[in-house]
Amino acid sequence: MVIQQRIRAENLKKIYQLVNQNRSISRAALSKETNLSKPTVSSLVDELIVNKYLIDCGTVASQQMGRRPNELRVNGTENLVAVISWRRARLDIALITADNKIAFRDQIPLTEEEDKVDKITSTFFNIMKPKVGDRRIMGLCIIIPGIIDAENKRILSTVIGVGYSDPVVQRFEEAFHDYPFCLLNDTACFAYAEYVFANITEPNFAYINVSKGVGACLFANGKMLRGAGGNATQFGHFSVDRNGPLCACGNHGCVERVVGENALTERAEACGIDLTRFAGRKPLYCDMAEDGDAHAKELIKDLAVDLSFAISNLITLFNPSLVVIGGMGVNLGPFFLSNIRDEVQNSGFKEFVSNTWSQYS
């Protein structure tokens, strides 16, 4: 009986995922896709409809002869996913319907003094949950810029200052024990979204997130390597300068330390850019470079050289056909990307780097 229940649960999950991925799919198509009998599929679909996970939208036009099939969709009206993105100085929060619509979103500031786990917990229960109403929370996702060691229930992030000895995972599990809950790496989430919504057709590609932290996610044969915990690579802590500045990880000259958003002020000043003239505003280095500012061009080129050295080594190790650059790095504009494309060709294994295309997210 237990085995049968487990098989049925797996089949329910499979049916739901297929409906979620294929808008307007029919029972007949589900039967063909899953190799399950039509009565079995109908029974599974009926259970998902009764429990308000799916809706039957009635008959739709079909090229086939005979009775027209009924269209199935996920029930976005009744089901939500809660998402909390843990950043250094704020929480980005959202409630997403099962059919991928934003029902609610906000930003919650964080201070250095606050206990971040307590803040996240109170944000969920006091701000997000009241917005849910009678709808169902299908799951809670907490996204972090760091490594998630699910097996040992540990996370490590130099960006938000969490170490392996901090009992963050255990505290979250205790706080959210009544809800399906997961921790996800931010770069893995961005990469998956790129793969699904930007229609990436390359089976082997790398997504590089250049923000305050720098991370990479690798896809091989259309599959994310080692899941969404950020354990496949610590690209941001590859050293591009062994004599470079000290990184929070204890290494010197890490990509994150010299190319990440937190390094921009230091590097801009080193290139002779007078930041006092911006009076608290963020400098738009892309616009400055396009307007011919020599110092801004020097800054962007230097950043591209350092990032390209790391990318070329990643290409030599992994041999992707595509590298997608996302995050705040895209704000450095076309001059940054063109320099990356040029500089990648100057290092790494020529046969690999010459067959890899780089583009923005």
What does each model-identified segment do?
Residues 145-148, 211-213, 329:
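Short glycine-rich anion-binding loops that position phosphate/pyrophosphate groups of nucleotides
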